[in-house]
Amino acid sequence: MLNIILGGAPGSGKGTQSDLIVEKYGLQHLSTGDALRAEIKSGSELGKEIGELIAGGNLVPDHKMIHLIERYLDNLPADCKGVIFDGFPRTVAQAEALELLLERRHMKAVLLDMFVEEDEVIKRLLNRGKTSGRADDNYETIKKRLQVYQAETKPVCTYYLHRHNYFAINGNNSMEDTFCQIDNILRLIQK
């Protein structure tokens, strides 16, 4: 089973590349961002809490995210070829918890880290904010999200690097060139 953690700063192109990977490899796509936005839209108490955290540029607490992931893994179809984790794990504690969840299921994952220059990330997110209407795509919140990413999520890369499950991807390139890098790595992993 091919399990991929698609990492990178907000706006690095994780969602776009996830779609391309799903199309080519037939994997299940778990976008935690989509799952969290759906919870917010539901109007539940949890959704309200999550909405306030996200609007402020903060991460959702680990225990809530881990519960969401465990529920997702428990409901995978029997013929599942693998999962793309888009937006998870975002902390080392989440990475450790994910590793345990996967080990219990005799699975493992690799991290594909999409690096994009900060100026390019800001430009992409501001442009996305104009068309998406997402409250978290404004300059102040973007800067805070990038600070949170550097402080809390970037260490996840080191965690996977030490486990030899880390691959760096240059996300500054075109969508096609970036996918070509990813595709080459995935073909090597599957051999």
Predicted regions and their residues:
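Glycine-rich phosphate-binding loop of ATP-dependent small-molecule kinases
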Residues: 1-191
